[in-house]
């Protein structure tokens, strides 16, 4: 009885080891920030493509919210980034404000700190994701937002007509870096607070991410 049992235990251990290797292989390459380099230059030199770049940002940003295990938080961040990228593709003024394309949006100065700040510990999450389950959530959210179908932030008549969302500002009230429950720009008349966001059969509450819609569409929109 001892020998078959021992073989069974060895087989089980081999399966577990194989499973761990498969899970680890889902994670992206671990990158390092060397002296004199910026986060952007490291990612570009490593050949990271836009889908992975978006996934890395969603992964790190979700952790910075304090709600890194919530799939809706991942989705909200991914859609927010793509809203900026898509609006910037058609509006020079929005491109100046939020950046050009996914890379420009992600690395726009002052927009996604601490996730892409060289001086922040959270940048380690961006450079070297280690949590497989959270990476899966981030990747699924990024794929959904990149696909572009069913954007939960397209709500107004203008947005439906142009198939673009004006929801481009967001704030994480539960983040350790939050200055309070409300965003610093809360009283800005150029932005309108969105409230809770329906996502399919679920709702992303504003207590997790506060989203803001531009009060007016850009006047230089190209078609």
Region locations from a protein language model:
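Bacterial extracytoplasmic/cell-wall-associated proteins, especially those involved in peptidoglycan
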Residues: 30-223
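N-terminal export signals and maturation junctions of secreted/periplasmic proteins
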Residues: 2-3, 7-51
